[in-house]
């Protein structure tokens, strides 16, 4: 019995040590990444290869003779233009949406917002159709209403095997002519509008979403995913214009 006692003690010590190590290796709640720490959703390719990132959009061959379809919200005399290249199915874009809404509310007189489509077709199966849904709504004067609904209800349709019925439901909720909406969502003009945005975005160096420009200059991702940082960047731009 005396010979077995040291062995039992040694085994007990080893078990305690292993348990302690396991607890140390388990990530704490504070160490888990939150959505704000998510990287932007990217195409996985470098769309700017061979291009001068400082060159104006007009000088880039891919954007030649293409007038981007611009959806604007805000005062026409606002001194700042904030442009978003977004994908309605992109989770970081969904996270950015309420941040942008707060910015619009706080800087109503100073900031005008523009949205450009950049659906990541190879990653998000419903993204391109969502972009067309927004454009079909735009033909009935309700682009921004559909834009907001798509982001705010992103989880409802993002992984749906067939998103069309969901989008038709949104059209009804917004009071759209559903028959016209159904025709427009698959029309060539609507598809071309989305592709025009993608082409111009690629020419500007966009490779992921959300990508945001403030008065023509790209805003770092770590800034746009933090309300206080984005607010400070806007205040700095406003001060520079005084």
Report residues per predicted region.
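Short clusters of hydrophobic/aromatic residues that line enzyme substrate/ligand-binding pockets
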Residues: 72-73, 157, 219
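Alpha-helix initiation/capping motif
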Residues: 75, 122-123, 160, 183, ...
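A short beta-strand-turn-helix
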Residues: 63-80, 105
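Juxtamembrane proline-rich low-complexity "stalk" or linker regions positioned immediately after a signal peptide
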Residues: 31-62
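Structural alpha/beta surface segment adjacent to cysteine/selenocysteine redox centers
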Residues: 78, 83-89, 94-172, 177, ...
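C-terminal cap of thioredoxin/glutaredoxin-like
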Residues: 1-40, 168-242
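Short, surface-exposed alpha-helical recognition segments that flank or form part
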Residues: 57-58, 91, 185
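A generic local structural motif
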Residues: 67-70, 99-100, 198-200
């Amino acid at each position: 019995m005396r010979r077995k006692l040291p062995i039992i003690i040694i085994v007990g010590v080893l078990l305690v040590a292993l348990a302690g190590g396991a607890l140390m290796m388990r990530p704490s709640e504070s160490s888990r990444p939150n959505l704000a720490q998510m990287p932007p959703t990217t195409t996985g390719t470098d769309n700017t290869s061979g291009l001068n990132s400082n060159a104006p959009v007009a000088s880039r061959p891919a954007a030649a003779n293409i007038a981007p379809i611009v959806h604007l919200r805000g005062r026409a005399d606002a001194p700042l233009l904030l442009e978003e290249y977004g994908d309605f199915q992109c989770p970081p874009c969904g996270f950015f949406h309420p941040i942008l809404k707060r910015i619009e509310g706080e800087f109503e007189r100073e900031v005008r917002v523009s949205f450009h489509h950049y659906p990541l077709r190879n990653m998000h199966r419903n993204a391109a159709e969502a972009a067309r849904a927004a454009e079909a709504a735009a033909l009935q004067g309700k682009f921004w209403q559909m834009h907001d609904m798509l982001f705010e209800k992103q989880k409802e349709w993002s992984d749906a095997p067939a998103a069309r019925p969901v989008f038709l439901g949104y059209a009804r909720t917004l009071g759209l002519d559903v028959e016209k909406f159904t025709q427009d969502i698959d029309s060539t003009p609507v598809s071309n509008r989305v592709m025009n945005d993608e082409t111009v975005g690629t020419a500007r160096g966009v490779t992921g979403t959300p990508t945001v420009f403030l008065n023509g200059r790209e805003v770092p991702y770590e800034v746009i995913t933090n309300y206080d940082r984005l607010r400070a960047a806007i205040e700095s731009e406003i001060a520079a214009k005084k």
